[in-house]
Amino acid sequence: AAGVLSGCSASELDGLYRFGRQLGLAFQVVDDILDFTGSDQQLGKPAASDLASGYLTAPTFYAMEEHPGLQALIAREFAEPGDLDQALEMVRSSRAIPRTRELAETFARESRDAIAWMSDSPCKRALLELPDFVLSRLY
């Protein structure tokens, strides 16, 4: 909306849209990682609550590539005792978290690239700090 109100061209509006979309995707992917690596206190909800609720996120899909048995646990909705713990171990012992981190970094880079057309200014510098802030939640 700010781009429209400030008279940006169609291509500039597209760049601003791509910035916001890719930044939002980076944020969501970081949130997906934290669901497996964060504490209940950090998250404000139980860790692994997305998986327990049946939400399949990037780490889960990546882990299923390495651990096909994970799909069966998810399909039966963790009905057996220990299913959720076993699923968590499959995700944590795989390359799912590092691969998802790479995905978040890609989205963050794409958000920065989307506003490369902007001339240097305090506003642009502030926007360019946002992807780094999103990624900083991982460390």
Identify the meaning behind each predicted range:
Residues 1-139:
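All-alpha prenyltransferase/terpene-synthase fold signal
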